Swiss-Prot record:
Disruption phenotype: Mice show severe defects in osteoblast mesenchymal cells to compaction, proliferation, differentiation, and mineralization and to a delay in bone nodule formation. Suffer also from an excessive microvessel growth. One of its GO terms (cellular component) is plasma membrane. Residues 58-200 form the PID domain. Key regulator of the integrin-mediated cell-matrix interaction signaling by binding to the ITGB1 cytoplasmic tail and preventing the activation of integrin alpha-5/beta-1 (heterodimer of ITGA5 and ITGB1) by talin or FERMT1. Plays a role in cell proliferation, differentiation, spreading, adhesion and migration in the context of mineralization and bone development and angiogenesis. Stimulates cellular proliferation in a fibronectin-dependent manner. It comes from Mus musculus. Expressed in the brain. The keyword Cell membrane applies. This is Integrin beta-1-binding protein 1. Residues 1-10 have a biased composition (Basic residues).
Length: 200
């Protein structure tokens, strides 16, 4: 049932609009195996701000990533049950084991751009747009080791629609955990910038 006998575990701060990166081994109630993993999480469902502003976020920070897959239009009850980073990671694990999400991404690389307006995933020539995620519809972002032993990390987004009636999960592969954490950091700065400008 488990890929190479490994399971993902995470720990994360519940502080809103902050990134938490911790390394620790956690025992699982699903079995005796555990491994160390580093998880960065961004909870955006908040009105808190660190007060830091970045006026350069009109321009986009760009990262080369690969697209793994998505689970769209989750029911409200199912979507709301996926609150913490561990909930998202476990849900994605089960979806991969059930064949709803692939373990490996498409070969094609995409450009993930982050700005104060949200996230845009486009083709490397910038002519085609794969996905757009408006900033105000992103509920949580979490990144973690993919568990396949190649040093790659997964970046998962939980989004909602404008009416908050449906939830979706979007999964991308990053070249490293450092790249995934950098994306989380830029997105956190984008939220802080918008929240700061809203208060002024």
């Amino acid at each position: 049932m488990f890929r190479k006998g490994k399971k993902r575990h995470s720990s994360s701060s519940s502080q809103s609009s902050e990134i938490s990166t911790k390394s620790k081994s956690v025992d699982s109630s699903l079995g005796g195996l555990s491994r160390s993993s580093t998880v960065a999480s961004l909870d955006t469902d908040s009105t808190k701000s660190s007060g830091q502003s970045n006026s350069n976020l009109d321009t986009c920070a760009e990262f080369r990533i690969k697209y793994v897959g998505a689970i769209e239009k989750l029911a409200v009850s199912e979507g709301k049950s996926l609150e913490g980073p561990l909930d998202l990671i476990n849900y994605i694990d089960v979806a991969q084991q059930d064949g709803k999400l692939p373990f490996v991404p498409l070969e094609e690389e995409f450009i993930l751009g982050v700005s104060k307006y949200g996230i845009k995933v486009s083709t490397t020539d910038q002519h085609g747009v794969l996905h757009r995620h408006a900033l105000y519809l992103i509920i949580r972002m979490v990144c973690y080791d993919d568990g396949l032993g190649a040093g790659k990390s997964l970046l998962a987004l939980k989004t909602t629609d404008a009416s908050n009636e449906e939830y979706s999960l979007w999964v991308y592969q990053c070249n490293s955990l450092e790249q995934a954490q950098a994306i989380c950091k830029v997105l956190s700065t984008a939220f802080d910038s918008v929240l700061t400008s809203d208060k002024s």
